[in-house]
Structures are given as C-alpha cells and as structure tokens.
A protein has these predicted regions:
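N-terminal helix-rich module
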Residues: 10, 16-34, 41, 45, ...
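N-terminal single-pass transmembrane signal-anchor helix
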Residues: 1-15
Length: 128
C-alpha cells in the first residue's frame, strides 16, 4: 500500500510539473507576440516602417527602423527552427504587414507556429 501511495504521489507531481512547463512555454510565446505587437504599435506611433528579419535556427530577430535605428531582439528560451513564406516582416505606419506567412518557434521541447495575417497586421500562434 505504501508503494502504491508513493507511486501515485510521484505521478501526480510529475503531471503538475509537465503542465507547469507547458504553461511556462506558452507564456514565453505570448511574450514574443506581445513584443511583435509592440513593434507594430511603435511603427504606428512614430509614423515609420519597422522591418523584422527572421533567420532559421536563430534566437535573434533583427529589427530595422525606417528612421535608421538597427538592433537585435532576443527570443527568450526559444529559437526559430523554420521560416515559411516570410523572411522579413514589415509593419508600415498604418500597422499592416507587408506579406503573410509563418515561422516555427521551438521553446524547450514544444513547437509553435507563429502566424502573420496580412489584414490589419494580426499575429497569432498555434501549438504544433
């Protein structure tokens, strides 16, 4: 009986730990999307275009502002593993995106597809 109780307790605690890791990874994805939304808002607020350069197998997104600033943005605990149809994303001064596409983001052992919609610059994710 004691062995059964110990096994049950261990399985419940590991379930909670794996759930916690998944929720933490989704939080990282939401933080990335929030940062991308910030770049869109900055483009609108400063009346300029902002271009994001996406590279396969990279944890860095390069940012180029129309007014000349260039800098890198680091993806926390993740990296881009695949880029589909979109190597650059440009938010114009109205906040729309120049083209649609997606990239695969790996956060620890979980994969997420980050999807850019051309209409109104919408960004969303789907767990793979």
């Amino acid at each position: 009986m004691l062995v059964l109780t110990i096994l049950l307790q261990l399985s419940l605690s590991s379930f909670n730990f794996s759930t916690l890791l998944r929720v933490n990874d989704e939080l990282k994805v939401n933080q990335l999307i929030t940062q991308l939304e910030y770049f869109k808002s900055k483009a609108i607020g400063e009346n300029q275009s902002i271009t994001l350069l996406l590279s396969k197998n990279s944890s860095v997104i390069k940012v180029i502002e129309q007014k000349g600033k260039k800098y890198n943005f680091k993806i926390l605990d993740g990296k881009i593993t695949y880029v589909s149809k979109v190597k650059t994303i440009t938010f114009n001064k109205e906040g729309t995106i120049n083209n649609f596409g997606s990239f695969i983001l790996q956060v620890h052992n979980h994969l997420y597809r980050i999807i850019f919609h051309i209409d109104k610059g919408r960004i969303r994710y789907a767990k793979i």
